[in-house]
Amino acid sequence: MERLQGLLLWLLLSPSVVWASRGPLRPLCRPVNATLAAENEACPVCITFSTSICAGYCPSMVRVLPAALPPVPQPVCTYHELHFASVRLPGCPPGVDPMVSFPVALSCRCGPCRLSTSDCGGPRTQPM
């Protein structure tokens, strides 16, 4: 009976979640301008540069009632299309690569958070 109640609640709320996610005031998942810093321990200077990153709202759902169903994956705003650009760190000694590459968001989408390329906010098993 509890499973049926949870399913019924989900079916009732799903259309309102879809409707609410199409509202004109919500911050969409989209590329936005950002200023980042680049550094290398072997180089004396840290520089800042501008790029575009993915940011904004992705519709999500959290179950209020305990359910026997598995947890619902929460989508995040992530890269859909991107290219890489580079900046040169000044003053690096010979033998040290002065180039730092970074992603530039061309388009974004709501999708699963991939631990292989993103910081998803939880514990990591390996460094990026």
UniProtKB/Swiss-Prot annotation:
Entry's Gene Ontology cellular component terms: cytoplasm; extracellular space
PROSITE patterns given in the database record: GLYCO_HORMONE_BETA_1
Top-level taxon: Eukaryota
Keyword Secreted among UniProt keywords: yes
Disulphide-bonded residues: C29-C77, C43-C92, C54-C108, C58-C110, C113-C120
Keyword DNA-binding among record annotations: no
UniProt entry keywords in alphabetical sequence: Disulfide bond, Glycoprotein, Hormone, Secreted, Signal
Main location: secreted
Xref: Pfam families: Cys_knot (PF00007)
Signal peptide: 1-20
Function: Promotes spermatogenesis and ovulation by stimulating the testes and ovaries to synthesize steroids.
Subunit and interaction comment: Heterodimer of a common alpha chain and a unique beta chain which confers biological specificity to thyrotropin, lutropin, follitropin and gonadotropin.
Name the record gives this protein: Lutropin subunit beta
Lineage: Eukaryota, Metazoa, Chordata, Craniata, Vertebrata
Gene name tied to this protein: LHB
